[in-house]
């Protein structure tokens, strides 16, 4: 179905949150919502922005009935307050000095979410959102070193997924490149929790270094 409403703006990401479809604009400046339970209908006044440290919006995720708007360097959390007009309100104090480096690199995982990113002037790592105001790095030095071999443009196309097998939970992060071997790094959340250290391994397709193909 094509969206024909004149108030719809070009968008890169979308989430469903309490009856609303929440979009972020391609220019990374604003977020806007559909009418309640009407995904094809929009009001030009139903928009907002990240305000604590308004960097460019990269992606978003709904977790624990809250909407996290993840910028290039920071993350702000919104809740649905209903009422007339724009229904989302920033939660006071729910602010993290870490952002996303790829719009495809955030995934729900083990009662929270993981993301590919970092803070201002930081190199790319992989993080776990520990609370509404704190992110904890889960990638170790070896994984970080391998990630740094990819360019910013390549990292911007990196993507993630999660799965469980035999009672263990895994998050998969794939970085593709035409210059160097592509890589797929796997975080074992269950083993990490039991050992107290981040446990990583790698998936490959074929006999040579290559990213994993599902």
What are these regions (language model features)?
Residues 25-41, 77-85:
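Blade/loop signatures of beta-propeller domains
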């Amino acid at each position: 179905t094509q969206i024909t409403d004149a108030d719809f703006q070009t968008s890169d990401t979308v989430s469903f949150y309490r009856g609303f479809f929440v979009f972020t604009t391609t220019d990374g400046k604003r977020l806007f919502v559909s009418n309640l339970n009407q995904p094809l209908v929009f009001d030009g006044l139903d928009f907002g922005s990240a305000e604590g440290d308004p960097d460019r919006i990269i992606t978003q995720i709904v977790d624990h009935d809250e909407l996290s708007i993840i910028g290039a360097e920071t993350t702000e959390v919104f809740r649905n307050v209903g009422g007339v007009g724009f229904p989302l309100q920033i939660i006071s104090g729910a602010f993290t000095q870490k952002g996303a480096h790829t719009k495809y690199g955030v995934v729900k995982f083990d009662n929270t979410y993981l993301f590919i990113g970092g803070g201002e002037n930081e190199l790319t790592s992989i993080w776990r959102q520990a609370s509404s105001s704190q992110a904890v790095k889960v990638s170790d030095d070896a994984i970080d070193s391998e990630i740094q071999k990819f360019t910013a443009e390549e990292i911007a196309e990196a993507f993630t997924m999660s799965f469980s097998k035999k009672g263990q939970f895994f998050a998969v992060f794939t970085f593709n490149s035409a210059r160097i071997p592509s890589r797929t790094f796997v975080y074992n959340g269950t083993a990490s929790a039991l050992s107290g250290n981040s446990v990583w391994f790698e998936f490959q397709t074929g006999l040579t270094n290559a990213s994993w193909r599902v």
